[in-house]
C-alpha cells in the first residue's frame, strides 16, 4: 500500500442482484479513491459480467491480501473467491447459489476486518429468499454480522447530509412500537446511542429524543407516553451526565438536527426516522451498524431484481456508503 487512506472492504452482495453493478460503477468515481483504498470481495466472473452490463471497462487486480492492492482509479482490487458458476447464475432471480455466495463474501470481509486488513466494510444488497435457498439461516446482513462478530444486539444509525438518526424500535407493528416506549428502554437507548456516537468520534453537541404523539403529547392531552416514559428517561440520563434533551415534536426535531442544533435524533419507531431521512435524500441515506468490533456502512436498498442486469441501477448510495465508511474509520474505536 502506498498511502495511509483507510482500506474499505466491499462484499459485492447477491451476484444475481444489482450489487455487482453498483460496485463497479462506484469504482469509476474519483471521489472513492480520494477518500479510501477500496477492495472488492467477490467473484471475478461476476464483476466482469457486471462491467458488461454497465458498459464499464476497468482492470481487475486479483489479490490475496490487502497490502497487494494497487488502489488506483481504473483498477479494481479484488479478493476473488471464485464461487460462482456464471453459466448457472440467473440474473434477477432468487437462487441458492447466489445466496450462498453472498454469505461467503460477507464472511470473508468480516474475517479480513477482524484480522486488521480492513478498516471498515461497506455492504451491498443481499436477498433473504436467496439466503434461505442457499441454506444460509439468517434473515439479513445485520444478523449475519452480529453472529460473525459475537455481537448480541447491534444498533442501527442512519446518516444523511450530516443528520444522524437512531431507532428505539424497528421491525415491529406501530401498535407494538408504542408499547415498547418505556422509561427503561428509552434510557437504555440514550446510553447506547451516546456510546455509539463516541465510538464514531462524535463528541460535540447533544442528542434529541423525538416525541411519540402529536406535539409530544401536549402534557398528556394527546397521549401520556412522553410524561410516563420519555421525560423520566431523559431526566435520568441527564443526571448521569449524558447530553440529551426532549421530547421534541417529531414535526420539527429532524429539521432542527439538520440545522445543527442536535448531533443526532433518537426516533421512537421505524417510519418516524425512515420518512425523515429518506424524504431528505433517499439515495444518500446510509445505514451505519454500531456496537460491533468492526465498522460497517450499507446502502439502504435491496437487490432490485427487476432491473438487475440492465445497468440502470444508481451507484449514488454505494458511493455514499463507501465514503461514509472512510469518514468514520479513522476515528472508530473497537
UniProtKB/Swiss-Prot annotation:
GO terms assigned for molecular function: metal ion binding; NAD binding; oxidoreductase activity
Free-text remark on how the cofactor is bound: Binds 1 divalent metal cation per subunit.
E.C. number? 1.1.1.408
Signal peptide range equals none
Which residues make up the binding site for substrate? 141-142, 278, 296
The prosthetic group or cofactor this protein requires is: a divalent metal cation
Coiled coil stretches, renumbered: none
Q: Where are the transmembrane segments?
A: none
Catalytic function, reaction form:
4-O-phospho-D-threonate + NAD(+) = dihydroxyacetone phosphate + CO2 + NADH
| Keywords for this protein | Carbohydrate metabolism, Metal-binding, NAD, Oxidoreductase
Residues binding a divalent metal cation = 171, 215, 270
Q: Which domain of life is it from?
A: Bacteria
The record, for SUPFAM superfamilies, names: Isocitrate/Isopropylmalate dehydrogenase-like
**Quaternary structure per UniProt?**
Homodimer.
| Record-stated family | Belongs to the PdxA family. PdxA2 subfamily.
The job of this chain, per UniProt, is described as:
Catalyzes the NAD-dependent oxidation and subsequent decarboxylation of D-threonate 4-phosphate to produce dihydroxyacetone phosphate (DHAP).
Query: Could you identify this protein by its name?
Result: Putative D-threonate 4-phosphate dehydrogenase
Which species does this protein come from? Clostridium botulinum (strain Langeland / NCTC 10281 / Type F)
Gene encoding this chain? pdxA
Amino acid at each position: 500500500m502506498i498511502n495511509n487512506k483507510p482500506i474499505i472492504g466491499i462484499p459485492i452482495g447477491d451476484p444475481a442482484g444489482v450489487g455487482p453493478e453498483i460496485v463497479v460503477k462506484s469504482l469509476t468515481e474519483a471521489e472513492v479513491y480520494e477518500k479510501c483504498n477500496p477492495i472488492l470481495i467477490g467473484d471475478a466472473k461476476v464483476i466482469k459480467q457486471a462491467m458488461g452490463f454497465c458498459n464499464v471497462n476497468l482492470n481487475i487486480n486479483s489479490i490475496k491480501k490487502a497490502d497487494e492492492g494497487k488502489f488506483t482509479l481504473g483498477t479494481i482490487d479484488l479478493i476473488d473467491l471464485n464461487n460462482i458458476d456464471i453459466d448457472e447464475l440467473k440474473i434477477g432471480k432468487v437462487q441458492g447459489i447466489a445466496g450462498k455466495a453472498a454469505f461467503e463474501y460477507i464472511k470473508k470481509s468480516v474475517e479480513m476486518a477482524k484480522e486488521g486488513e480492513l478498516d471498515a466494510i461497506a455492504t451491498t444488497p443481499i436477498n433473504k429468499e436467496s439466503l434461505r435457498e442457499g441454506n444460509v439461516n439468517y434473515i439479513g446482513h445485520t444478523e449475519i454480522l452480529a453472529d460473525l462478530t459475537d455481537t448480541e444486539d447491534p444498533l442501527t444509525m442512519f446518516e444523511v447530509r450530516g443528520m444522524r438518526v437512531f431507532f428505539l424500535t424497528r421491525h415491529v407493528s406501530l401498535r407494538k412500537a408504542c408499547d415498547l416506549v418505556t422509561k427503561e428502554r428509552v434510557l437504555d437507548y440514550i446510553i447506547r446511542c451516546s456510546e455509539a456516537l463516541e465510538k464514531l468520534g462524535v463528541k460535540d453537541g447533544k442528542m434529541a429524543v423525538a416525541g411519540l404523539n402529536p406535539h409530544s403529547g401536549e402534557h398528556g392531552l394527546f397521549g401520556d407516553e412522553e410524561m410516563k416514559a420519555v421525560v423520566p428517561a431523559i431526566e435520568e440520563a441527564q443526571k448521569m451526565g449524558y447530553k440529551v434533551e426532549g421530547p421534541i415534536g417529531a414535526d420539527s426535531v429532524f429539521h432542527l438536527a439538520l440545522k445543527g442544533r442536535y448531533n443526532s435524533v433518537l426516533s421512537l419507531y421505524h417510519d418516524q426516522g425512515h420518512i425523515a431521512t429518506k424524504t431528505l435524500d433517499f439515495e444518500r441515506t446510509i445505514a451505519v451498524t454500531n456496537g460491533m468490533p468492526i465498522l460497517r456502512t450499507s446502502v439502504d436498498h435491496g437487490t432490485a431484481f427487476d432491473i438487475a442486469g440492465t445497468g440502470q441501477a444508481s451507484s449514488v448510495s454505494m458511493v455514499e456508503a463507501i465514503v461514509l465508511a472512510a469518514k468514520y474509520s479513522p476515528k472508530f474505536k473497537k
